[in-house]
Curated annotation (Swiss-Prot):
Cofactor(s) demanded: FAD; FMN
Catalytic activity: hydrogen sulfide + 3 NADP(+) + 3 H2O = sulfite + 3 NADPH + 4 H(+)
Composition bias type Basic and acidic residues, residue spans: 220-242
Job description of the protein: Catalyzes the 6-electron reduction of sulfite to sulfide. This is one of several activities required for the biosynthesis of L-cysteine from sulfate. The flavo-protein component catalyzes the electron flow from NADPH -> FAD -> FMN to the hemoprotein component.
Keyword Electron transport: yes
Source species of the chain: Thiocapsa roseopersicina
Gene that this polypeptide is encoded by: cysJ
Name the UniProt record assigns to this protein: Sulfite reductase [NADPH] flavoprotein alpha-component
Length: 522
């Protein structure tokens, strides 16, 4: 082929390059042209590489950041759906994911909640901080999508999800779906987003070989009963959308009658194989509205409670919806009440009063992998709790006693009044007497003019706090968001004043071994 035969369809050279090449090669002998040809091939880095089609997806990584278990459940459901469609999907907690490997991933779907004042969940903290850093690398080859869970009544609604979506795009990652922010009633939004994400991925993700098993022929009624029993044994686990029906064994008020808060201790009968919970977990409780109140509303507006209505994708009668599905003060869908294991929540006093012994209630397990006892039984524990935030520590000490773990334990507890609101006082006294509770620091804010809070006790015990942490103690914080922030500030002061650290590096959240710090919001 001569240069004059080059054209735009076959050559990557424009007319200017062709003209320059003609001038350079003019007058060369065949030997010289052969040498130039070899030289150009050498500096060209090898044979010509033609453009290729986009590489098929080999693996989908679903990362979740979850404080109460909702985001984890959504991520696991998404992963299960992807696997059912033949995709190679893995679901990983952000706390177990190495942020530096993000650039190596092929496709990433993020499901993350927001807690506190727009803060990431504990297990999302490291990844969130990594991508926000100015030194974070470029991610041009990474397709991603983000789903956020939050409470739209808060100012920083789904802030963590917004952060991930914005920053990944800034780093050059390819957004395959718009950011989806979901409020408390998130089921329909998460299902729609999950379907959209899987549809986008299905065209490129190669299918794994599916195991198709022929159903056995059922030759008798006995075979049928056996098959039905096996099907029940393979039923999906209990979760928010498939709650377990537990029987109430005890409903006991653990504050005095003249206390401001009516805090309840509930004991539930749960089959051993129904759910496997660990200290630090919480229960989600679907609490029904008072049927008499629903009847009063129906009578007041003159509507038949048997009238059929549509609620989401479900059709049911209006009275049933008012009792089990709707918040009667606002008529938006009810939300699960979170109950710390072994304690009542002050936000559900009326519901707690209505629960009678032997009554059944729907529950599901809200696991919290970020709020666990350390594996080593001799690890010291500093347990900071306010109000019902003390409940998980009751379970912690019970577990340590059952396991015979010798680690030292320090309880720092705050509430309104010593005589009215000292939750589980007899339990703490028993642990103290048995030698399992080495230190107890109390702060009752309404018993005198001083008005002490747990953060004040921390400052007073600053030197001892540092000694325990230097000995490898794990520090836990459980209570309202504002209390957790106040504890953070107190710890910064302790590290700044007592240890001489720079304020910017004085938070336990920036500790090299951050596993020593765990939080749980109420």
């Amino acid at each position: 082929m001569v240069l004059s035969q080059l054209n735009g369809l076959t050559s990557p050279l424009d007319e200017r390059h062709v003209h320059a090449l003609q001038i350079a090669l003019k007058g060369m002998t065949p030997t010289q042209l052969a040498w130039v040809s070899g030289y150009l091939a050498g500096i060209g880095g090898g044979p010509l590489r033609m453009p290729t089609e986009p590489k098929a997806v080999e693996r989908i990584t679903i990362l979740f950041g979850s404080q109460t278990g909702n985001a984890k459940a959504v991520a696991e459901q998404l992963g299960a759906r992807a696997s059912e469609q033949g995709m190679d999907a893995r679901v990983i907690s952000m706390g177990d994911f190495n942020p530096r490997k993000l650039s190596k991933e092929q496709w990433v779907l993020i499901v993350v909640s927001t807690h506190g004042e727009g803060e990431p969940p504990e297990n999302a903290y490291a990844l969130h901080a990594f991508i926000q850093d100015q030194g974070a690398g470029r991610l041009e080859q990474l397709p991603f999508a983000v789903l956020g869970l939050g409470d739209s009544s808060y100012e920083h609604f789904c802030r963590t999800a917004v952060d991930f979506d914005r920053r990944l795009a800034e780093l050059g990652a390819q957004r395959i779906l718009p950011l989806q922010c979901c409020a408390l009633d998130y089921r329909s939004d998460t299902e729609r987003w999950s379907s959209d994400a899987l549809n986008r991925l299905s065209a490129l993700a190669p299918r794994k070989a599916s195991n198709v098993v022929a159903m056995p022929t059922l030759r008798s009624h006995q075979d049928l009963r056996s098959h039905q029993e096996q099907s029940r044994n393979r039923a999906r686990p209990y979760d928010k959308d498939n709650p377990y029906t537990a029987t109430l064994l005890e409903n006991r008020r653990i504050t005095t009658l003249d206390a401001v808060s009516d805090v309840r201790h509930l004991a539930l009968a749960i089959e051993p194989d129904a759910m496997h919970y660990r200290p630090g977990d919480a229960l989600g409780v679907w609490v029904e509205n008072d049927p008499s109140l629903a009847d009063t509303i129906l009578a007041g507006v003159g509507i038949d409670g048997a009238a059929r209505i549509e609620l989401g994708d479900e059709e049911l009668d209006l009275r049933h919806a008012l009792i089990e599905r709707l918040e009667l003060t606002q008529l938006h869908p009810t939300t699960v009440r979170g109950w710390s294991r072994a304690s009542g929540r002050t936000g559900a006093e009326d519901a707690g009063e209505r629960l009678e012994r032997e009554e059944q209630t729907r529950i599901y397990l809200a696991g919290n992998d970020a709020f666990r006892l350390p594996d080593a039984g001799d690890t010291p524990l500093i347990m900071i709790g306010a109000g019902t935030g003390v409940a998980p520590y009751r379970a912690f000490l019970q577990q340590r006693a059952a396991n015979g773990h010798p680690g030292r334990n320090w309880l720092i507890f705050g509430n309104r009044h010593f005589h009215r609101d000292f939750l589980y006082q007899l339990d703490w006294q028993a642990h103290r007497k048995a030698g399992r509770l080495d230190r107890v620091s109390l702060a009752f804010s309404r018993d005198g003019a001083e008005k002490p809070y747990v953060q004040q006790r921390l400052r007073e015990e600053g030197k001892e706090i540092l000694r325990w942490l230097d000995a490898g103690a794990h520090l836990y914080v459980c209570g309202a968001t504002a209390m957790g922030q106040a504890v953070d500030h107190a710890l910064v002061e302790i590290f700044t004043i007592e240890a001489g650290l720079d304020p910017d590096c004085a938070s336990l959240r920036r500790y090299p071994a951050r596993e020593c710090y765990a939080t749980d919001d109420l």
